Amino acid sequence: MQRFNTFNMIHKALRAMLYDTALTMQQTYFADTDEAAIALEKMNHVIHAFEQHGMHEDTILMPVISKYDQSMIASFEDEHKEDLSMGNKLMHLHKIYNATESSEERILAGSVITRAFREYMVFNLEHMQREEVELNQLLWEHYSDEELL
């Protein structure tokens, strides 16, 4: 029997946002500020979505299951802090891009942002996969599907 996956819908949406934004970043010509603005707005939207998602998990989900495995929950909370740090780095790089004055500087800043976003994407993909395996297992050991719904 397949159990209820608490993360299924939101993680699908978050992964789609990551993939879409990564593709946009990959295809953006950062010397063109109008084109870059579209990519950077998508990036900001992704960062905000992940911040909200992490905050939701930390305030709603983690307190409910921390009594079953505090060290596991602490490791996820640490990863949420790392995610915030990576998001802040991307926002800082965005500010640097906005301060550029030449096409060459914009292209270089765009390259750095794109690389940092790929790292952010990989981190979050691995984090969500870990949640879907480890946290679901913990939830399934202690709660019925009816309780999870």
Where are these regions (language model features)?
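Small-residue-biased structural context
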Residues: 1-149
